Amino acid sequence: MTRVIVTRPLREGQPWLQVLRARGWDAQALPLIELGTAPDQTSLNAAWQALQTPGRTYQALMFVSAAAVDGFWAARPATDSTSRGDGTRSIRCWATGPGTRRALLAVGIAPEQIDAPSTEAGQFDSEALWQVVSTGLRQDARVLIVRGADAMPGSVDALGGSGAGRDWLAQQLRAAQIEVDFVVSYVRALPVLDSAQCALARQAATDGSVWLFSSSQALQNLQRILPGQDWSMARAVASHPRIERAAKSAGFGAVKLARPVLDELMASIESLA
């Protein structure tokens, strides 16, 4: 049985582990990104306050990932925990992909409030999201981009080099005369792997395991954890062209591109198994 290495942060990776195991794969968790609490809670509190202040609120909140949603709602004022008097009832919520959309639904955002690329979109990224939202914006609008921050300088996030996805979207918004604010709702850090996890990673570099990557930073962290490891016999499935390029640059011998939807991931895994 081919082993599949799920590299997503532990909480985000659990659904994939369950599905893969149900389909008969030997799926193993090897989280290559550690998620933590945002260091500046003051900025998060200010963002929530703006949502409750007439004349200061946003037309849309853009979330770069499911972790961004979770971190943002973790800072929600306790007095609004049941009333939805938090200013989000009428604001559009933008998601780049299905995982982020599910996270928004889980915190109580109504499906009709969410803008996201369709499940048939060629990619789930900022460019695809822009095609959905660009025609419905007011020129005097404000958009808040809720993102993560890297604990280590120079890291690459799931949207591309140095936050390329969110920076590209912010440029499009500003060119359309839209005011853009940012707030950090979580941090991404290098995980500390134990000896068994390091042994699993080394073995999976040569034994035919299939690695699943949904973040370029996960690849960077893997290279930091195992410097000098030869990946020429390793096989991987990447969820975005930027991540595909990063895997090839890291030396992975075989890399398949697949959107992060179940049927495509399964087909790519099977083609490498």
Sequence positions of predicted segments:
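Conserved beta-alpha
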Residues: 1-273
